[in-house]
């Protein structure tokens, strides 16, 4: 146990520089990246270590069970709807932050995660509570994959390799992940800095600032950038938040790129607040972010799939819908999908 505590403490304290590089963007620092919100604070190393230990214990010896509502989806409609002749844009919740989006002939995935655990270890770490809403084998042809950051619940290397082998999509990632993926044998990758963009098969993809952090090992904290994504077609605009705390970046994205037809925002992993408050949104903050983004439809994601935090596992959608109702947002504009559910947007 002392060795484990030492390892976790080192992981919690590992960091890059904090001062912006002369002449560079304000989020670039020596050896990596930082959040630019002057109010941003990360908990001290001991607080993070205590949390990591408590989560390791809970996931190993005191795991909670929960299964989010789900519907069967054999992928037939999605496969028949792929391509330029589809009847309209669709979105399918596979689970956690994994969405399958069909828009104007492009079929894309966000933060694809089909593994049993969100962990570097096959035998430990957060276990999937609900199977994916689509079996990997029934996916339609995937043209594009967006990855928000390198945490294991968002960048699952086994899934990425399977997608590269089976579909050969273009992976679009924040700065620093292209070389890392190349080292894993995944080479069809383009990386972007905040506010950078590219065109792919007629849709525009924009890398949007987020307030979070990155880390996959003891020594690489914040060496790779984190981001949200905007996907802009001729008829629809999608905002995918990935992981982010609430900050002024939502308002900026709404002003520069909005209004958005659909905003997919994380509503889970917000307790304890001393750990989560700057890097994850509460359900109420997600509703505020939706309004900042000038959204038409709010979709709550990042809940009910992995046990990552301490709030009741079924609480996030209840709080999101209650806050949306309190603000006068009608039910047809505040969505909680069942795992596997597809809707037109």
PLM regions: where:
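Bacterial N-terminal signal peptides
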Residues: 2-12
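Metallo-beta-lactamase
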Residues: 13-138, 174-242, 261-268, 319-341
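Cap/insert and terminal regions of metallo-dependent hydrolase folds
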Residues: 14-40, 136, 144, 151, ...
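Active-site metal-binding motif and surrounding structural segment of the metallo-beta-lactamase
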Residues: 48, 123-172, 188-190, 258-264
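Catalytic core of the metallo-beta-lactamase
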Residues: 98-104, 199-261, 277, 281-285
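Acidic/histidine-rich helix-loop elements
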Residues: 112-132, 213-220, 271-280, 307
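A short acidic, amphipathic alpha-helical/loop segment
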Residues: 158-163, 184-185, 249-253
């Amino acid at each position: 146990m002392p060795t484990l505590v030492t390892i976790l403490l080192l992981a919690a304290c590992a960091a890059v520089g904090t001062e912006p590089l002369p002449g560079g963007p304000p989020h670039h620092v020596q050896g990596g990246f930082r959040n630019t919100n002057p109010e941003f604070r990360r908990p001290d190393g001991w607080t993070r270590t205590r949390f990591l230990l408590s989560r390791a214990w809970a996931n190993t010896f005191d795991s909670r069970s929960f299964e989010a509502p789900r519907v069967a989806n054999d992928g037939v409609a999605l496969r028949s709807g792929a391509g330029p002749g589809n009847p309209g844009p669709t979105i399918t919740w596979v689970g956690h932050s994994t969405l399958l989006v069909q828009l104007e002939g492009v079929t894309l995935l966000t933060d694809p995660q089909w593994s049993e655990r969100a962990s570097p270890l096959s035998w430990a770490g957060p276990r999937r509570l609900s199977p994916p809403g689509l079996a990997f084998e029934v996916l339609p042809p995937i043209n594009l994959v967006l990855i928000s950051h390198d945490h294991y619940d968002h960048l699952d290397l086994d899934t990425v390799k399977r997608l590269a082998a089976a579909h050969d999509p273009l992976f679009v990632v924040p700065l620093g992940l292209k070389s890392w993926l190349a080292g894993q044998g995944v080479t069809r990758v383009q990386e972007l800095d905040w506010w950078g963009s590219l065109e792919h098969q007629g849709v525009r993809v924009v890398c949007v600032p987020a307030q979070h952090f990155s880390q996959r090992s003891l020594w690489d904290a914040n060496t790779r950038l984190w981001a949200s994504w905007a996907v802009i077609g001729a008829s629809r605009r999608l905002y995918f938040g990935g992981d982010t705390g609430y900050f002024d970046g939502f308002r900026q994205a709404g002003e520069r790129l909005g209004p958005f037809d659909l905003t997919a925002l994380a509503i889970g992993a917000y307790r304890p607040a001393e750990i989560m408050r700057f890097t994850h949104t509460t359900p109420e903050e997600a509703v505020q972010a939706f309004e900042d983004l000038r959204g038409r439809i709010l979709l709550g994601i990042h809940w009910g799939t992995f046990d990552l935090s301490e709030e009741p596992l079924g609480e996030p959608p209840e709080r999101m819908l209650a806050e949306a109702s309190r603000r006068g947002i009608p039910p047809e504009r505040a969505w909680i999908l069942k795992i596997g559910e597809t809707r037109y947007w």
